[in-house]
Amino acid sequence: MKTDYDVTVIGLGPAGTLTSLLLSDSSVNVMGIDKEKDIYNLPRAVTIDDEGLRILQRLNLEHIYLNNATAIEGAYFLDDKLNKLSGIDIPSGHLTSNGWMPTMLFHQPYTDALLREELLRSTCSVKLETELVDLIPKGNHYIVKTQNLTNGEEISFSTQYVVGADGASSKVRNIMKFDQEDLDYDKNWLVVDVKLNVENTLPRFAAQICDPKRICTYIPSHLPFRRWEFILLEGE
């Protein structure tokens, strides 16, 4: 049976967007839906590595991250007196066998906005402010039931494959009743992203301070941003 779309991607964050663009680049007929109108405007991920840049290079989109990212000098584990325990140095200009720097730090709202623009210019069909309602198996394909969140209109279409890129609380996973593996890590962290107003002398390396009283992490995010992460203790 001929379906309306070859692949439907649920969730258009960076993972869903890049999946859609890569499929479209291979002449796959793609529908992407997301329940939100706009990208999430707070930073979450901050790091992209050489393999990620290599994937973007296939789409000629590596500039999105290169123009919005900063290289770092290394990454270290420090004790509570800031003495180095272990880590790696990253020499300036060092390239891996993939032809890119091993890691760069970016500001996600910048890069996500540019990826969204690329998606909307592509041959992918896109429905925003549209929520997945149900996935109904029909032989060798699925009927995707959706609802427009602005006017309540329900729209259904057929697809050969479905990609669930809708995050930790994935509706695709819940509908399909897929198991979620729990790695039993239940610690909460306070993540503080700071936009600097003036030049600073903060180090250009990432560090985790292994203080037994409170573990914390410092990330020299893409200028003018910096990130600190603090583990929350019991009762906090």
Each language-model region and where it sits:
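Core beta-strand elements of the Rossmann-like FAD/NAD(P) dinucleotide-binding domain
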Residues: T3-Y5, N151-Y161
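Conserved FAD-binding catalytic core of PHBH/FMO-like flavoproteins
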Residues: E117, Y161, A165-E236
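Conserved structural-core and active-site-/substrate-pathway-adjacent residues in large, well-folded domains
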Residues: V9, S20, L56, T111-L115, ...
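Residue-level detector of alpha-helix initiation sites
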Residues: G13-P14, I39, G167
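Active-site-adjacent segment of FAD-dependent monooxygenases/related oxidoreductases
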Residues: R44, D49-L120, I209, I219-S221
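A conserved short coil-to-beta-strand element within the FAD-binding core of flavoproteins
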Residues: L128-I143
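N-terminal Rossmann-like FAD-binding beta1-loop-alpha1 element of flavoenzymes
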Residues: T3-G32
